[in-house]
C-alpha cells in the first residue's frame, strides 16, 4: 500500500489531495482539502506577491504537510502555477516554502500546466475532440484536443482574480469598467486565431466552471449532485451570466450554488467563458471536476503502473475495474463473466432491442458493478448498487448514461412501481430510454442467472431469433449440475416475453471443451 499526496498552489486557492494505491494497482482518493489563499491578490501593480498573500499560503502549506505526515504519506508532489510563475519574487517565495515547510515546491510552465490539466480531463471524460479551458485566478490555459491528443495549447494572461483587481476599482463594476474588461478579454482571446470558429465543445475546469455547474443544477433541481461531466447549453450559461451581472456583491453571495468566497470575482470568470463561447462559436459547455491535481496523479500513476503511458485507452472499463479491484478475486471473476454473457446476449438480440453502441457501454458498466451494493448490505443490494454506481468515479459515460446504467442494476432485480417513484435519477431518462432500460435489464438478469452458482461453467451461447420465440442454446461444461441455473433462468421467462414480445426457450447442451 502506498500513499501519494499532491498539492496544487494556484493563484486563488491551494488544493491538497491524498491517493492510496494498493498492491493490485487499484487506487482511491482518501483525503482532500482546499484553502482560499488568493496568492495573486494585489500583485498586479508591482508584479510581486504580497507579504499577506504569501503568509496565507505558507500557513496553508504547513497545515497540509502536517496532515500528510499524520496520514503517513510516502511522497508529496507540490506545484505552483501562474501567480508564482509571473511574480518577480516567485523564487524567494519558493525558498520560503522550503524553509518553513520542507516542501520542494515546483513552479511549472504554462505548457506543463495545460498538459497536466489535459491528463486530468482525458482520463476521466470520454470526449475525443474538444477545447479545454482551465480558468484560474491569474491565467487561463486553453488546449485544443483532437482524437484525445493535444494539438495546441496556450496560457492566456487573464484570470478571474487578476481581471477583477485590474478593472474593478470600487465595490462593483461600473458599466464602463465592465466594458473595458470585456474588450480586454476579447482582445486577448482573438490573438489566437486557431480558436476562431472551431465549433468544438468547451470543457471547463477550475472553480469558475464548477460554480457554473452548481448554479445550473440548483436552478433545475438536478437529481445528481455530481459536477464532473455535467453539460449545459449556451443559453442556460448566458442566463446565469446575465443574472450574476445584474446583482450586487451581497446579492451574489446569496445565489444558490455560488461559493460566497468566489462571489466577488465570478463576473470576471464568466466574462472569459462567454468570450470563449463566442470566439470558438460553440453551443455546449461540459464541466470537468478533474483537472490539474488529478493530472498530477495520472502522470505519476502512468509512469509507475502503466509502463509510462499516462493516457488510459478505455476509461470506462478502467474506472469500473478500479472499483472492482477493491472486491475479492471471486467477486471480480464473477462480475467480468456476467458482463461477457450480457454483452453476448445484447449483440445477438440487437434486432429486437435496436439500441446503439452507447447503451452497450452502459450494460458493460452495469454488468461489472451489478453486485457492488452488496458491500453495503446484501438485502436491497440492487438499490444500494444503483446509488453507488451513480456516485462512484465511473468515467467515460455521461450523467444520463450513468443513470441508465444504475437503472439497469436496480431493474434487473425487479423494480416495482413504488420503487420506481423513488428512483431519484428517473427524471434524467425519457420514456424511450426507460422502455429500452426494461429490455436491457432483462438481458442483465439472464446473464446473472446463467452464473447463479458463481461457477463460470457456461462456455458458449448461441441465440436464434424466431417469429414467436427466442431460442438460447447454452453450452456448459460436461458433468456440471445445472439445476440451480436452470431454475434461475426459467424465472425470467415471463418478464422476457413481456419486454420482447416473444417466448424464451432455453436449450441446454453439455460441452466437452474446456476452452
Can you say where each PLM-predicted feature lies in the sequence?
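A short interface-forming secondary-structure element
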Residues: 472-487
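N-terminal glycine/serine-rich phosphate-binding loop of ATP-dependent small-molecule kinases
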Residues: 1-5, 9, 14, 19-80, ...
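Short, surface-exposed alpha-helical segments at coil->helix boundaries
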Residues: 87-94, 486, 490
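Acidic, divalent-metal-coordinating active-site segment for phosphoryl/phosphodiester hydrolysis
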Residues: 138-144
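Short secondary-structure junctions
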Residues: 452-457, 498-502
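Helical "lid/coupling" subdomains associated with nucleotide-phosphate turnover
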Residues: 18, 42-67, 81-88, 101-123, ...
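Short glycine-aspartate micro-motif
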Residues: 4-8, 130-134, 202
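A short amphipathic beta-strand at an alpha->beta junction
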Residues: 500-515
Amino acid at each position: 500500500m502506498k500513499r501519494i499526496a499532491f498539492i496544487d498552489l494556484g493563484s486563488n486557492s491551494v488544493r491538497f489531495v491524498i491517493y492510496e494505491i494498493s498492491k493490485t494497482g487499484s487506487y482511491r482518493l482518501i483525503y482532500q482539502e482546499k484553502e482560499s489563499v488568493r496568492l495573486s491578490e494585489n500583485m498586479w501593480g508591482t508584479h510581486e506577491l504580497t507579504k499577506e498573500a504569501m503568509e496565507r499560503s505558507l500557513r496553508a502549506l504547513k497545515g497540509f504537510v502536517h496532515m500528510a505526515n499524520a496520514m503517513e504519506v510516502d511522497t508529496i508532489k507540490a506545484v505552483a502555477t501562474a501567480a508564482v510563475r509571473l511574480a518577480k519574487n516567485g523564487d524567494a517565495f519558493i525558498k520560503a516554502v522550503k524553509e518553513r515547510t520542507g516542501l520542494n515546491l515546483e513552479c511549472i510552465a504554462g505548457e506543463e500546466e495545460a498538459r497536466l490539466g489535459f491528463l486530468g480531463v482525458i482520463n476521466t471524460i470520454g470526449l475525443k475532440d474538444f477545447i479545454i479551458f482551465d480558468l484560474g485566478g491569474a491565467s487561463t490555459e486553453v488546449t485544443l484536443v483532437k482524437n484525445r491528443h493535444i494539438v495546441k495549447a496556450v496560457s492566456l494572461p487573464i484570470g478571474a482574480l487578476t481581471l477583477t483587481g485590474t478593472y474593478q476599482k470600487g465595490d462593483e463594476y461600473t458599466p464602463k469598467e465592465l466594458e473595458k474588461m470585456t474588450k480586454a478579454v476579447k482582445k486577448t482571446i482573438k490573438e489566437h486565431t486557431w480558436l476562431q470558429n472551431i465549433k468544438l465543445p468547451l470543457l471547463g475546469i477550475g472553480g469558475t466552471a464548477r460554480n457554473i455547474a452548481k448554479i445550473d443544477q440548483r436552478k433545475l433541481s438536478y437529481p445528481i449532485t455530481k459536477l464532473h461531466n455535467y453539460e449545459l447549453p449556451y443559453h442556460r450559461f448566458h442566463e446565469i451570466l446575465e443574472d450574476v451581472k445584474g446583482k450586487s456583491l451581497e446579492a451574489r453571495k446569496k445565489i444558490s450554488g455560488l461559493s460566497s468566497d468566489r462571489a466577488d470575482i465570478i463576473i470576471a470568470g464568466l466574462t472569459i467563458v462567454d468570450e470563449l463561447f463566442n470566439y470558438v462559436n460553440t453551443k455546449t459547455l461540459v464541466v470537468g471536476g478533474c483537472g490539474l491535481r488529478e493530472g498530477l496523479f495520472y502522470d505519476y500513476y502512468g509512469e509507475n503502473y502503466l509502463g509510462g503511458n499516462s493516457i488510459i485507452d478505455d476509461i470506462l472499463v478502467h474506472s469500473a475495474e478500479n472499483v472492482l479491484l477493491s472486491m475479492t478475486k471471486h467477486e471480480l471473476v464473477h462480475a467480468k463473466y456476467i458482463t461477457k454473457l450480457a454483452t453476448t446476449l445484447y449483440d445477438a438480440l440487437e434486432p429486437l432491442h435496436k439500441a446503439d453502441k452507447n447503451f452497450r457501454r452502459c450494460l458493460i458498466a452495469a454488468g461489472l458493478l451489478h453486485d457492488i451494493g452488496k458491500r453495503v448490505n446484501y438485502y436491497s443490494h440492487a438499490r444500494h448498487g444503483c446509488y453507488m454506481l451513480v456516485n462512484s468515479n465511473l468515467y467515460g459515460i455521461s450523467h444520463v448514461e450513468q443513470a441508465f446504467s444504475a437503472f439497469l442494476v436496480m431493474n434487473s432485480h425487479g423494480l416495482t412501481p413504488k420503487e420506481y417513484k423513488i428512483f431519484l435519477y428517473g427524471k434524467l431518462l425519457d420514456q424511450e430510454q426507460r422502455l429500452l432500460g426494461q429490455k436491457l435489464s432483462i438481458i442483465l438478469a439472464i446473464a446473472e442467472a446463467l452464473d447463479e452458482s458463481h461457477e463460470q461453467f457456461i462456455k458458449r451461447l448461441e441465440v436464434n431469433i424466431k417469429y414467436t420465440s427466442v431460442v438460447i442454446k447454452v453450452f456448459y461444461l460436461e458433468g456440471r449440475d445445472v439445476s440451480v441455473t436452470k431454475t434461475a433462468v426459467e424465472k425470467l421467462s415471463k418478464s422476457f416475453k413481456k419486454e420482447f414480445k416473444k417466448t424464451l426457450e432455453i436449450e441446454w447442451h453439455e460441452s466437452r471443451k474446456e476452452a
